[in-house]
Amino acid sequence: MLPSNVIKELQELTQTNRKGVDALFEAESELAQKEHDLDLVEAQAFLSAEGTVADRQALGRLEAADARLQRDLAKAKVNRVRTKLKVIESEIMAQATMSKMMQAEMKL
């Protein structure tokens, strides 16, 4: 691999990493909104239900099932973005190591 290729790869990975930070913010914002929506649906269902506290809680959870699914999907998205960022950071470190090895070889 040529030094210019290593530099180009590092630049591309760094740019992708920056985009990933923005994607993580968007995913975390979406997750916060979904958690808020879930809390509202559960609370409204609990307050409108009749019966014992246990019955009302169970009905609240049932009525909030779709909102909970959306929240769980948003969590999965956040985790996916975080994982991708870790992979990119590992690739950056590997490329940086290759760059240093190439520098050492050139000095020989």
Where are these regions (language model features)?
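Short acidic DE-rich linear segments
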Residues: 1, 104-108
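Short, charge-rich amphipathic alpha-helices with coiled-coil/heptad character
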Residues: 1-20
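Long amphipathic alpha-helical coiled-coil segments
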Residues: 28-31, 35, 71-102
